[in-house]
Amino acid sequence: MLAVLGNHDWHANRRDEVAAALAEGGIDVLERDHRILEVCGAELGVAGTKGFAGGFDGAHIPDFGEPLLRAVYAESIREAAALDAGLRAIALCPFRIALLHYAPVTDTLEGERPDIWSFLGTDRLAGPLREHHPDLVLHGHAHAGTFAGRVGEVPVYNVSVPVLGEDFWVFEMTGAARAPSEVH
């Protein structure tokens, strides 16, 4: 089982403690990393990173101003670069998933107050998704958001528990269409 940490996991500098507890339970935390797994005889590549805040077209946090604001910008750029590197590393896998915490698209933020969207994700994460076309993108964080969206032709799903109304959701990866189908 794979996971990425979210903002609550990082709160109060408890990242290592949370990751260790997950590892004890057999959960591998991806942090600017990737894994290639064999599932039913086929390779499944997963690129995982937290992502970060940063805003969307017309409302990006810029690389300008106070050092703390510029640090937010820099972190969003580092996370997008990590996603790009992870997707490059799994490019030859027949099935590819991007696993994020923050949203890469506003489609899945509908339902949240628009004035907080910049804190819920950034479309800087969408660039690597458009370039590498993973089969499935999963994120959380937007607890009042919407389940499904897209980055171009790439399906994006907000799988936060409040949005799902369930503890988990099952996606079936089909080889013929190279697109996930819901199996809920």
Predicted regions and their residues:
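Active-site neighborhood of phospho(di)ester-bond hydrolases with catalytic His/Asp-centered motifs
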Residues: 1-7, 28-33, 97-100, 129-145, ...
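Acidic/His-rich segments in extracytoplasmic proteins that coordinate ligands and/or metal ions
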Residues: 2-20
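Short, flexible micro-motifs
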Residues: 9, 51-54, 143
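Short N-terminal helix/helix-N-cap motif within the alpha/beta-hydrolase-1
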Residues: 12-13, 107-108, 147
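Conserved catalytic scaffold of divalent metal-dependent phosphoesterases
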Residues: 16-117, 160-162, 173-175
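Binuclear metal-dependent phosphoesterase catalytic core
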Residues: 37-40, 110, 123-135, 143-184
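Structured catalytic cores of enzymes that bind and process phosphorylated ligands/cofactors
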Residues: 73-74, 78, 141, 183-184
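A short, acidic, amphipathic alpha-helical segment used as a generic capping/interface helix at domain edges
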Residues: 83-90, 121-131
